[in-house]
Amino acid sequence: MPRFLVAALYKFAPLDADGKLQADLKSACEHHNVFGTLLLAPEGINGTIAGPSAGVHVILAELRALPGFDTLEHKESHADTQPFLRMKVRLKREIVTMGVTDIDPVDDVGTYVEPEDWNDLISAPDVVTIDTRNDYEVRIGQFEGAINPHTVSFREFPDWFRQFRETRPDARIAMYCTGGIRCEKATAFARMEGVDDVFHLKGGILKYLETVPEAQSRWRGECFVFDRRVAVKHGLELGSHTLCHACREPLGPEDLRSPDHVVGVSCPHCVEGRTPEQRERYAERHRQEEMARARGEWHLGQPGAVRETDG
């Protein structure tokens, strides 16, 4: 039976995000052997944590005890090994960085659509489905027929969306992301831009994969996650992807068979952009990682939380 409970969580609500709260939460997590990342900002909390089930639920209870966070929701999955190397609690300006002011992800967002109703929505001929995630995430899995904005970061989404709206000004829009948080902001932004018919998948891809039977699913591929599992598939089972330790791109079976893939050094996505000196440095880091693994230790240079959690 899996030893670790993984909880992905977020909530938009006013928060007094200060150093004391940061220190208190980190201390509580470490006391209960809970690792992961929590982002604190004036607009709310976002993160993923993992550890013994009892410890994770203690931390969730502490978060829900904060004023305005009693309705914080989380999504659970499980892992046989700890998917994080350490606990990080960070103070940020935004819990998911879009860089747009004046949007209201608390009170003015799109219409939530339950996972069991999602297929009907995105099958409608007048609905355009948009993946709000970044290109490296979309590459390994997405919903059938969804548009990939090819963004490198979520900051690029507003400009892309404005250009898209010029070509489809009257479209009904369905948006989705990993756990729901980016869609809160993306649909709030769409509302600010004057879009009335905008919908988003409640609980994100993770809730859909947990809820909808694979035989009925419109999802194709795997879902990138922001921890050492790299990707999950239907039923939130561990996926087949791993990471390139040089560029942190997700690698599937075909990537691993490529002659450009050298474990710890390069992959098809970064081989052309690395100097001989960089490759030597990556090779030495990989050697240190293997030595640490042989001793039953973690080498802190290993990719842990792949990128800061976007949700």
Swiss-Prot record:
MF-aspect GO terms: oxidoreductase activity, acting on paired donors, with incorporation or reduction of molecular oxygen
Top-level class of the enzyme under EC nomenclature: oxidoreductase
GO biological process, one term: tRNA modification
Domain of life of the source: Bacteria
E.C. designation(s): 1.14.-.-
Domain Rhodanese as annotated: residue spans: 123-217
Basic and acidic residues: compositionally biased ranges: 277-298
Reaction(s) catalysed (UniProt annotation): uridine(34) in tRNA + AH2 + O2 = 5-hydroxyuridine(34) in tRNA + A + H2O
PROSITE patterns found in the cross-reference section: RHODANESE_3 (PS50206)
Active site: C177 (cysteine persulfide intermediate)
Region (Disordered) residue spans: 277-311
Any single Pfam family the record assigns to this protein: Rhodanese
InterPro entries: Rhodanese-like_dom, Rhodanese-like_dom_sf, TrhO, TRHO_N
Keyword field: Oxidoreductase, tRNA processing
Family to which this protein belongs: Belongs to the TrhO family.
Function: Catalyzes oxygen-dependent 5-hydroxyuridine (ho5U) modification at position 34 in tRNAs.
Name this protein carries in UniProt: tRNA uridine(34) hydroxylase
